[in-house]
Amino acid sequence: MSAHIYSYRGELIENRHTASLAIANPSGKLIAYAGNPELAAHLRSSSKPFQAQVLFQTNAVKHFGLTPKEIAVTCASHSGSPDHVATVGSYLKKIGLGPEYLACGAHLPFDKESMWLLKETRQEPTFLHSNCSGKHSGMLAAAMTMGATPRGYEQPDHPVQQLNFQTMRDLSGAQNIPYGIDGCSVPAFVRRLLGAPREVEPWLVRT
């Protein structure tokens, strides 16, 4: 049976979304699900921690002296708040590149206060406001550390993206990783719902 998510306007259901989901324990064993736990889907932003591994694989963390804050914004979808924008800006400055190198595009901040401030002051959002700009900064940092061109880093055949594909192959054991192109222009891996938590399992910190 699929999961249904409802949104209401007043007392009436305005939207209904059908979803499939899978819940696994730390060993990757399926413990609960709705819909089809074997459904293949694009990981999209859920893959950001996987994609951030290039920082460590290329030694970019040490090469540029990246801070925990900069590593965190690489792994996450940020809200475009002033603090997040400043973090990405200093990140790029540290690796010697400007915002124009980001291939993620621009959109209004998710942070409502920041969004309304831009609208009220008639300012356009920049690439730094994109929720994916931290991830893209990490890819640029990896490219610079590798000695690869920062231009075209979002393309599937770029050395940075080839490293990302290898990470997914190593974690999944699959030789072929299907993908599409995400809204921010980089490859979006396709994985099974149940496969994704099993692939995260080796990274879990147990206390």
For the regions a protein language model found, what residue spans apply to each?
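Short, contiguous, pocket-lining structural segments
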Residues: 13, 43, 128-136, 153-160, ...
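Active-site SXXK
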Residues: 44-61
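Active-site-adjacent helix/loop patches that line small-molecule binding or acyl-intermediate pockets
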Residues: 67-174
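Active-site-proximal alpha-helical segments within enzyme catalytic domains
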Residues: 189-207
